[in-house]
Design a protein with these regions (language model features):
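Extracellular beta-strand-rich solenoid/capping regions of secreted or surface-exposed proteins
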Residues: 9, 13-16, 28-40, 47-92, ...
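Right-handed parallel beta-helix/beta-solenoid
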Residues: 1-14, 316
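Extracellular beta-strand/beta-solenoid scaffold signature
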Residues: 50-58, 79-88, 103-110, 131-143, ...
């Protein structure tokens, strides 16, 4: 039989502001938290279950902490934003740590709140919808300032971490698997994406219609469509990333004044595909054994060398380094007639 549910709401209501509600292992119903308090479970045996209806846990006051428990069974209506945990705009300075979220529409949705911390959570999205748009994102930040999303493990669902209309956010040290886009920025400025690890997604990191983004020391592997998708990205720095074994390592479209520096781009079908972009600096990157190193489409202007940093390393470079300075003496023009043909006639790519 089904284990009897313990009503969580009366326990919340009986907890004073500033106190900690300690939940032993057991099966609890969903609740709304409307005052500043902490809820601490005993690990995954402390289960808060929405039984497939609505949002499971709603945070509606500042300085709430949720830790060491499992949240499961929200409703599945993503158009109604049904989520495992909903962080309301009134819930500034929320902390959600070491929480498992599964079998939900969205995992954690932060809506217009400031300074949330989401750390060391394990979020398993669904994978049972006929179309991906019927699935929710693992962590969803909408109109959020100064979020820290750190060291979470996210799999399945639509996008792993989705950030829109948000500023000052740090997305660091997360691991995302088997989602559509692992990390997806839309209309989000002044954010950092550092030291994340993505694998087996359609796109590893997607930065769209955004500016002043720093993307550093990430590892992106097995992007079925793109490793990194940069579209209408402005004045951003992409440095020290490893992008491997994807269809395109980088897909670069409509981008201006961005710097790609010291990235390791290897074993992709195409190292970098560039279209309709200008005034971007690509320097000190290593292009290693991509089937096509570079494909141009449309008009693009790329500065390939930047003063003291030197040029880029190409594994297929043919030339001499007579003066022994480690930089080839003959300019390498990677966009040869073959990649021109590939861009114009995709079937050429054999």
């Amino acid at each position: 039989g089904v284990e009897a549910r313990i009503e969580l709401q009366p326990l919340i209501d009986a907890t004073a502001t500033g106190d900690t509600l300690q939940l032993r292992a057991g099966h609890y119903t969903g609740a709304t938290i409307d005052r500043s308090l902490s809820v601490r479970g005993q690990g995954r045996g402390t289960i808060i279950d929405g039984d497939g209806r609505g949002t499971v846990l709603r945070l509606e006051a500042p300085s709430i902490t949720i830790t060491h428990l499992r949240v499961t069974g929200s409703g599945r209506n993503v158009s109604k934003k049904e989520s495992g945990i909903w962080v309301d705009g009134s819930a500034s300075d929320a902390t959600i740590s070491e929480v498992r979220v599964d079998d939900s529409g969205f995992g954690i949705w932060v809506n217009k709140a400031v300074r949330p911390l989401i750390a060391e959570c394990d979020i398993l999205g669904r994978n049972d919808a006929a179309i991906i748009s019927d699935l929710g994102n693992g962590i969803h930040l909408f109109n959020v300032r100064d979020a820290i999303v750190r060291d979470n493990d996210i799999a399945q669902g639509r996008d792993g971490i989705y950030i829109s209309n948000s500023t000052g956010c740090l997305i660091e040290g997360n691991r995302v698997r088997r989602s559509r886009f692992a990390i997806h920025y839309m209309y989000a400025h002044g954010n950092r994406v550092i030291g994340n690890d993505t694998d087996s997604t359609s796109v590893g990191i997607a930065l769209m219609y955004s500016k002043h983004i720093t993307v550093r020391d990430n590892q992106v592997r097995h992007g079925r469509t793109h490793g990194m998708l940069l579209r209408n990205l402005y004045d951003s720095r992409i440095e020290g990333n490893v992008v491997q074994s994807s269809k395109d390592g980088f897909f670069f479209s409509g981008c201006y004044q961005d710097t790609l520096q010291a990235n390791w781009i290897s074993a992709n079908d195409v190292g970098i595909q560039v279209s309709d972009s200008k005034d971007n600096l690509l320097v000190a990157n290593a292009f290693i054994e991509n089937a096509n190193q570079l494909v141009y489409e449309g008009y693009s202007h790329v500065v390939w060398e930047g003063g003291d940093e030197g040029g880029n390393y190409w594994s297929d470079y043919v030339g001499w380094d007579r003066d022994g300075d480690g930089i080839g003496d003959k300019r390498h023009y990677p966009s040869d007639i073959a990649s021109y043909l590939v861009g114009r006639f995709p079937a050429v790519r054999l």
